[in-house]
Amino acid sequence: MAVGYVDCHCHMTAEEFSQDTEEVIEESKENGIQALISVTEHGGEFEKLIYLSDRYPDYIMPCFGIHPIQSNGDGQRSVTIKDLEPVLAQFDKYKDSLVAIGEIGLDFTPWLAPTSEQREEQMKVFQMQLEMAKRMDLPVNVHSRSAGRQTVSFLKEQGAEKVLLHNFAGRPSAAQEGVQAGYFFSFPPAVIRNEQRKKLIKMIPLENICLETDSPSLGPKKEDRNVPSNIRLSCEYIASVKGLMPERVREVTTLNALRLFPKVSCKLQK
């Protein structure tokens, strides 16, 4: 039996999927995807994600997390403790259903988190969620935009072991530090339009790479909605950069995902 894909980071509760969730999931299955690991950005998505994972058991694999950047009306702002505290009980309520904690991390984009106070609060929110993951023995699904080195260093300081650095765009030296710590890195279909990622992908061993789409964002065309079935584009691009067959990349990245997310592995073996 051929090994299918695992999309290690997508957003199935996004508004962009609200009208055709079933069609998107069927298309994913038809394109050989074994599991969708779906993350959240804020507490308002938690119940919706549990509903979806109950509706599509052993296919949509839920992760709870509070993202470092939050929506603020029609804009965006840096996360605060107040975004996390009211939903802490939800993590415990659904801990048996969760396969990871995410999307969590740091985002030091200058116009979103310009002050040291904002960045310190992001780190506190990140730390609290890392501690929760450790207590629940769950991996973490991590965001690190404009903070690659700081994120890897902080993860190591906190003793995080099961880590996916999604859509990593930090320096190769920071990636190397993550590889040495045993962390995994995933890349969405948008890498096909970003030459700068080629160096990173070439440097990171295949044994430390997973596949993701970050759907509905980061697709092959910036203006189009991304969908999980585009995962093959990530796979084919990584294969071309590394001079490997796509089948080999699919097989190894799926095995990596099942090692990193043991609860996903258990669900797929039912």
Swiss-Prot record:
One of its GO terms (molecular function) is nuclease activity. Keywords: Hydrolase, Metal-binding, Nuclease, Nucleus, Zinc. Transmembrane segments: none annotated. The keyword Nucleus applies. Coiled coil: none annotated. InterPro entries: Metal_Hydrolase (IPR032466), TatD-like (IPR001130). The gene is tatdn3-a. Zn(2+) 2 binds at residues 103, 143, 166. This is Putative deoxyribonuclease tatdn3-A. Its cofactor is Mn(2+); Ca(2+); Mg(2+); Zn(2+). PANTHER family: DEOXYRIBONUCLEASE TATDN3-RELATED (PTHR46317:SF3), HYDROLASE OF PHP SUPERFAMILY-RELATED PROTEIN (PTHR46317). Its main location: nucleus. It is found in: Nucleus. SUPFAM superfamilies: Metallo-dependent hydrolases (SSF51556).
